[in-house]
Design a protein with these regions (language model features):
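Ser/Thr/Pro/Gly-biased, low-complexity, turn-/loop-rich segments
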Residues: 2-4, 22-182
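Bacterial N-terminal signal peptides
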Residues: 9-20
Length: 182
C-alpha cells in the first residue's frame, strides 16, 4: 500500500516538473524571439516623448532613431534593442535613460497546402499548427495531418522540418499541410 502511494507521489511530482520545464521553455523561446521585418515594436524612453515611438520594421530591417541614426534591428531580441538604445543614449544625451522595447504585433505566419483558406494570418503567442489550420478554415478532406512541414528562418538561414499538429509555430513560419494519397 505504501509502495503504491510512493509510486503515485513520484509520478505526480515527475509530471509536475515536466509541465514546469515545458512552460519555462515556451517562455524562454519568446524572450529569445528575434525581430524580423513586419514586426511592430514600441520603443519607450521614460520622460522622453521625442525618443519614444511605435514602428513596423521594414523589409530592410533598419529604422532611423533620433540622435543614433540608422539602427539594424532584424535578428535582435527586444532586450538587445533595449540595450543598444540605452548604450547609444547614455552619456551624450541622457544620464540614465530608462528604455523599454515591447513587441506590439508579430509578423504574420503563412499556411498553405491542404487547408481551406491558405494565406497569411496574424501570429498570436501559443499558436499550434492545429490552431493555425483552424484560422485558415480547417483542413481539407485530402489533408495528411501526419505530413506537415514548417519552413523557419533562423539567423538568416531557412530550415525546413516536419512537425505534428500540436507543435507550436512562430512568427514568419511557413506551414505546409501536405496532401494525403488514398
Amino acid at each position: 500500500m505504501i509502495s503504491n502511494i510512493k509510486k503515485i507521489s513520484f509520478l505526480t511530482l515527475a509530471i509536475f516538473w515536466s509541465v514546469c520545464l515545458w512552460a519555462q521553455e515556451g517562455n524562454l523561446s519568446m524572450s529569445q524571439y528575434q525581430l524580423g521585418s513586419g514586426d511592430r515594436i514600441n520603443i519607450s524612453v521614460f520622460g522622453q516623448d521625442d525618443l519614444s515611438m511605435e514602428i513596423r520594421l521594414p523589409d530592410v530591417g533598419t529604422i532611423n532613431y533620433p540622435f543614433l541614426g540608422e539602427l539594424k534591428l532584424v535578428g535582435m531580441t527586444a532586450a538587445e534593442v533595449e540595450s543598444l538604445i540605452y548604450e547609444g543614449l547614455l552619456g551624450d544625451y541622457l544620464v540614465n535613460p530608462s528604455v523599454s522595447v515591447a513587441i506590439v504585433e508579430y509578423r504574420p505566419f503563412f499556411i498553405d497546402g491542404e487547408v481551406k483558406r491558405p494565406g497569411g494570418y496574424p501570429y498570436q503567442p501559443g499558436l499550434s499548427v492545429n490552431k493555425a489550420a483552424a484560422l485558415a478554415g480547417g483542413y481539407t478532406e485530402r489533408a495528411n495531418k501526419d505530413k506537415i512541414t514548417i519552413v523557419r528562418e533562423t539567423d538568416g538561414q531557412q530550415f525546413e522540418f516536419s512537425v505534428s499538429v500540436t507543435d507550436m509555430i512562430q512568427p514568419g513560419d511557413i506551414v505546409t499541410v501536405n496532401q494525403r494519397f488514398f
